[in-house]
């Protein structure tokens, strides 16, 4: 399985923090700041995990997840949300509630994409 992770979030500072955390944990990371850019990244890169913010400009993270899973139903997807609502939970996909400790992110990623 590819160890490249797609991180999609419209908050650039947060995306940079996640990239640094995941690279330190040994993963390659590509980023996108919109849902449409996330879909395009998936076309260009061999991604083994998609980490998607639920609320992004254009296409929402849960809609992106739905599109990606139509193409590859085995793709691990992890949603992130700062919302207190449970709308993302209904998707059946794992959800990290922002803010979350970096250790929680790495643990969730390792459950979905075990280290090589």
Show where each model-derived region lies.
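Receiver (REC) domain active-site loop signature in two-component systems and cognate sites
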Residues: 56
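Short amphipathic alpha-helix used as the core "switch/output" element in two-component signaling
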Residues: 40, 62-74
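Active-site residues of response regulator receiver
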Residues: 9, 53
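C-terminal output helix
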Residues: 100-113
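Hydrophobic/aromatic residues positioned on beta-strands within the core alpha/beta folds
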Residues: 80-81
